[in-house]
């Protein structure tokens, strides 16, 4: 039997799961795992909470807690979130587990002994007040490239530039707010540059890497790879296993990857199995697109250094925005999984997160669209077809599937589509095209409703019983197929269908129990039709419509939480300006004529904007929100009387108005027209 190792990106243990986490990583991974189990693949799906790193350490110091106290809380919360969404993990562990410490240190030592890790003396910031070195997140200051304040020691959120703490202008310690100074420190570096050519060969030759993942990795490779720091001067983390490395821990990205393997090892040891057999056969990583870089360059190079098999694929899911705006936990613009599931079934979330957009694309969660899809697609389309099939069978055929009657071209075409569906869906899932597989299912159920309406079996039982028999037989056959091919997508709802069909039902809620790893219903059973005379049970509607008032409640709650956070940020509105001050701002309608990315920045675009009497060069931080091509000829609102500023070394002569989520404010006004 072939084996499969599936890993889910490690959730960081400083907060609960929100809907974006489920959409990009955990739901797709679960679909893939459930499908593979049903096809007979011995599947192991693992995850751990990521519990080290500076954000947790900084928070613990600010709250005067032990970091472990924080991670204890969120490990449990995150685990409950994933269980509630029926993510069928075989193992959910922690990077604070003893076995993880040992495996991560062994990995480091192996690379060190092979000569892939070396010592290097670097400049670091040191706080005299705290009497210690300051790793990245312990420092904030002004970005040297775009001059934005509040840039972290590892990255500027405004221009997207990756930073070192020593790059910051006017840095200050986040713990005591004092100004640090530069001191030299010995750290350990991984020879990433030595793996540049092998990485290129792996990425170019790997046909299983999704296009978005491959393209992202190639961009970084084209810029050349620099050696990568593996250690930090901290007291929270996994100690560097060398005699002369006291006070140093492994950088979180030097050990978090190992969380996949240590989680698997914990599970395997418990059940007297070998986790590496799964790894060596086929490994697939499910992650968010923000860590594609780490999983296609850092991690594979470490595996090459160790002499271990590389992943079969890395699947990077896109971002989820909320009501057209970027999610922000600090501003309350977020939906937590726990809150969502207080009102709605997990299958509704799973369905909506998959059907909304291809996994490799960013998408948006809208309460109105969620209601529309549940009511129109799940209730009126899928649920309606299944319920009317069951109801009609029970009412007119004594709860037994009738034998086939007359057989028209329409019947034959419908039957062929039913028989083809399992392979169609399987092909999509095999290629990580989960939305396309679900679309194929929903498209056929829509056709099935039309087929049912066109055949009019309610008239046929009186006027053409042979036609009615065929219609109801084929409709039941499709429902039987749906009870299997929908299992990876909406596992709880499927059990209700199977119960009516007298099929084996399974415990699909929560994490996977070892004794239940082998599914009771196999994928290929969808290719077998039920015999005439097969008896079904009585049925209830599978889904219910979501009323308008429920959606209104959720929207009101979302906006009230955001407003509450705004009030907490600034209770007294101390930054009010007068009408005279505002009158000095000149807003002009402009039209974007050219747009190009700025080398080295993930967020900034250089734009040429026609203002009527002149064309202005404007630098805007919208690269993560817009593709270059979609900006051309877009009419925008420009603040035209700002002093010139250099962002990332490029002069900007104006500013575009945009929302917090970087959505540009547009207008139908004439180019060059002033806005008052």
Curated annotation (Swiss-Prot):
GO cellular component: aminoacyl-tRNA synthetase multienzyme complex; cytosol
Role this protein plays: Is required not only for elongation of protein synthesis but also for the initiation of all mRNA translation through initiator tRNA(fMet) aminoacylation.
Protein name: Methionine--tRNA ligase
Cofactor: Zn(2+)
Enzyme class: ligase
The protein's assembly and partners: Homodimer.
Binding site for ATP: 329
Keyword Metal-binding: yes
Principal location class: cytoplasm
InterPro entries: Anticodon_Met, Met-tRNA-synth_bsu_C, Met-tRNA_ligase_1, Met-tRNA_synth, Methionyl/Leucyl_tRNA_Synth, MetRS_core, MetRS_Zn, NA-bd_OB-fold
Keyword Methyltransferase (UniProt): no
Chain sites annotated for binding Zn(2+): 143, 146, 156, 159
Molecular function GO labels: ATP binding; metal ion binding; methionine-tRNA ligase activity; tRNA binding
Record domain tRNA-binding: where: 581-676
EC numbers: 6.1.1.10
Motif stretch ('HIGH' region): 11-21
Alphabetic keyword roster: Aminoacyl-tRNA synthetase, ATP-binding, Cytoplasm, Ligase, Metal-binding, Nucleotide-binding, Protein biosynthesis, RNA-binding, tRNA-binding, Zinc
CDD domains named in the record: Anticodon_Ia_Met (cd07957), MetRS_core (cd00814), tRNA_bind_EcMetRS_like (cd02800)
């Amino acid at each position: 039997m072939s084996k499969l190792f599936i890993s889910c990106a490690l959730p960081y243990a400083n907060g609960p799961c929100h809907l974006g986490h489920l959409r990009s990583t955990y739901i797709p991974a679960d679909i893939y795992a459930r499908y593979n189990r049903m096809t007979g693949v011995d599947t192991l799906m693992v995850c751990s909470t990521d519990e080290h790193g500076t954000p947790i350490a900084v928070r613990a110091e600010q709250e005067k807690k032990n970091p472990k106290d924080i991670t204890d809380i969120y490990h449990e919360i995150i685990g409950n979130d994933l269980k509630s969404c029926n993510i069928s993990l075989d193992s959910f562990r922690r990077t604070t587990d003893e076995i993880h410490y040992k495996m991560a240190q062994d990995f480091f030592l192996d690379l060190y002994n092979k000569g892939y890790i070396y010592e290097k003396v670097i400049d670091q910031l040191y706080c005299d007040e705290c009497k210690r070195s300051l790793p990245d997140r312990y420092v904030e200051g002004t970005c040297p490239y775009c001059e934005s304040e509040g840039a972290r020691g590892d990255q500027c959120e405004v221009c997207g530039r990756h930073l070192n703490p020593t790059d910051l202008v006017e840095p200050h310690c986040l713990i005591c707010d004092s100004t640090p100074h530069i001191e030299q420190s010995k750290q350990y570096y991984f020879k990433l540059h030595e793996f540049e050519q092998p990485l290129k060969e792996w990425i170019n030759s790997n046909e299983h890497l999704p296009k978005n993942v491959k393209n992202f990795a190639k961009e970084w490779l084209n810029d050349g790879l620099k050696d990568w720091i593996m250690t930090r001067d901290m007291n929270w983390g996994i100690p560097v296993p060398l005699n002369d490395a006291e006070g140093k821990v492994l950088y979180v990205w030097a050990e978090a990857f190992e969380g996949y393997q240590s989680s698997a090892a914990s599970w395997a040891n418990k059940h007297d199995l070998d986790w590496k057999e799964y790894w060596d056969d086929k490994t697939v990583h499910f992650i968010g697109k923000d860590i594609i870089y780490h999983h296609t360059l850092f991690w594979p190079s470490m595996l090459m250094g160790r002499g271990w098999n590389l992943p079969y694929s890395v699947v990077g899911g896109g971002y989820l925005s909320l009501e057209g705006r970027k999610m922000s936990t600090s501003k309350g613009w977020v939906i937590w999984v726990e809150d969502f599931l207080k009102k709605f079934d997990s299958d509704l979330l799973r369905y909506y997160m998959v059907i909304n957009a291809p996994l490799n694309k960013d998408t948006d969660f809208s309460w109105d669209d969620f209601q529309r899809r549940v009511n129109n697609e799940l209730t009126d389309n899928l649920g309606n077809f299944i319920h009317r099939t069951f109801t009609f069978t029970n009412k007119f055929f004594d709860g037994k599937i009738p034998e086939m009657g007359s057989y028209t071209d329409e019947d034959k075409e419908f039957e062929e589509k039913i028989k083809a569906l399992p392979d169609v869906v399987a092909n999509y899932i095999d290629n990580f095209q989960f939305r396309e597989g679900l679309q194929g299912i929903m498209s056929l159920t829509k056709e099935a409703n039309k087929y049912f309406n066109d055949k009019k079996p309610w008239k046929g039982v009186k006027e053409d019983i042979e036609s009615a028999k065929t219609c109801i037989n084929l409709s039941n056959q499709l429902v039987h197929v749906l009870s299997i091919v929908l299992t990876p997508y909406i596992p709880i709802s499927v059990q209700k269908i199977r119960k009516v069909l007298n099929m084996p039902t399974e415990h699909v809620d929560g994490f996977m129990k070892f004794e239940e790893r082998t599914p009771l219903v196999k994928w290929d059973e969808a290719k077998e039709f039920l015999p005439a005379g097969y008896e079904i049970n009585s049925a209830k509607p599978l889904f219910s419509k979501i009323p308008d008032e429920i959606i209104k409640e959720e929207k009101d709650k979302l906006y009230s939480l955001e407003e509450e956070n705004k009030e907490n940020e600034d209770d007294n509105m101390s930054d009010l300006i007068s009408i005279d001050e505002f009158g000095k701002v000149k807003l002009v309608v402009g039209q974007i004529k050219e747009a190009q990315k700025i080398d080295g920045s993930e967020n900034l675009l250089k734009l040429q904007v026609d203002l009527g009497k002149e064309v202005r060069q404007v630098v805007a931080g919208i690269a993560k929100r817009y593709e270059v091509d979609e900006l051309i000829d877009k009419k925008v609102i420009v603040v035209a009387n700002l002093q010139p500023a250099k962002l990332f070394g490029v002069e900007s002569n104006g500013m575009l108005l945009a929302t917090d989520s970087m959505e540009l404010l547009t207008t139908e006004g004439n180019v060059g027209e002033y806005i008052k």
